[in-house]
Amino acid sequence: MSALGQFKRWAVRLGAVALAASAAMPASARVSTGVHPYIEVQQVLNADLDSGETLTYTAVAAGVDAGVSTRRVRAQISYRYEKRFGWGDDLVDGDSHTGIAQLSADLIPNMLRASAGALATRARSDGVGPIFGFTNVDDPAISEVYSFYAGPELSTRIGALNVTGSYRFGLVEVDNKALRGLPLAPGAILLDRFDSSTNHSLSASVGMDVGELPFGWTVGGGYFLEEADRLDQEFEARFIRGDVVVPVGSTLALTAGVGYEKIESSQQDILRDAAGRPVVTPGGRLIGDPTKPRLLAYETDGIIWDAGVIYRPSRRTELQARVGQRYGGTTVTASLSHKINERYGLSASIYDGVETFGRLLIADLAAVPVEFDIRRNPLNNNVGGIGGCVFGTDPGTGACFDDAFQSIAGSSFRNRGANILFSGGRGPWGFGIGANYSSRRYYQPIVEQGFALDRRTDESFGLYAGATRDLSRTSTVSLDAYANWFDSGLTGAESAFSTGITGGYYQSFLFDRLQAHAALGLFTTDNGEFDSTVASALVGLRYGF
């Protein structure tokens, strides 16, 4: 079975498990359960203000928004399938799957929990443009991306000891068949694009809180393995380390840790012709040669350490910051969580790690809260709307996918950057703001002709903002805006910049079963070779069951 087939099977099982768990709970234990399927029809017009070209299509969609919340099970899913029919010969028909699902179930209360999640979205996969933004339905650079994860988590106490353990299985599939079919342009750079991967993550720790001793301590270890289809790539990481936390006041503690880590990334050599040139498919894909020895793309093996502070001035605020040695150089990481009040929250982080696309996407998906905001942008039905952030219903929580979707490449890379989320609401107002900066340095085998990304660095910055206001019980307005900048770092390639703003209006009728909506948007793209300004308009009707 293909990875895409496995994704669909597991996504269906995820929803079935959540609903079955809800049905199995006694009525007194239920908090809330809601399943809201719908069908929808839209008429969309896109006008390129630079060329004067106008494209029109009709979209027919079916989807479901559902949530379950009990004492032991919490789950939520937002899924949408859309079929688009182009008017005229300039826009071909197409379809798309978009959605996100999360599940958390307490198998043994206060001891063993199972978590699972699934994602279906669309993102640019040619490595030369902004991550998210306005695109036509038949843009071959846009790929369908599917991912799924599941696993148990153990957290318990044995006497004075805290014992934790977890296992997580992850699956990622990128459907970029349209891009594969394009002929390779003369002089084009060969990019090793991602296809699919499976990964396994295992961790365990034992420790003691401050109290039994004047300091807290933890000893733990972990193992990670990812196997990708392209060129039989393999990423393997293992570590063991010990950490201590020493309070120096009621709100401040010092922390330090030391350990050992080994990371190795390898893959097949590439097939070459008699002249030593790489053999590629008509779409520019490299072909592996299993008869040759495997190539090492990245390796680190040695002692790691870091030290820092933990600051908790109140139950609403926590700041952690660390500096150390890892990956052969200095690392700096930090995190901040601050509840301004019950209505507004803020979170931020500075990150540094060696990653792969599959590993990073699964980590981002697992960071999405179970209770998330299911609102979508009407002119770009991507996960989380136009931008790459999904906000939790708890103010200041959520996850941004920009660091994963910066480039859908098959290589391992050093990933450094920062992100910030600010969200909340009061009365009829609700809003979310997210920003992310990410820099990647790629690692590929050092061979003559064949790998274009080795030791190259790309960068991206994304800013997203969205707000809604309820005008009445049956009417709502929304406003969304984004700005993306991306520099691929490839020789001869210029940086790309895109912006967009969308406004929408929603009106419900017939006991809230029928909803009419309209939206207007303006989108710009500038990548040096191609500039465009597109105005978009939409009217639609949705019927909920």
Segments predicted by a language model, with ranges:
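N-terminal signal peptide c-region/cleavage motif recognized by signal peptidases
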Residues: 24-26
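Bacterial N-terminal signal peptides that target proteins for export
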Residues: 2-14
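Gram-negative and organellar
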Residues: 28-545
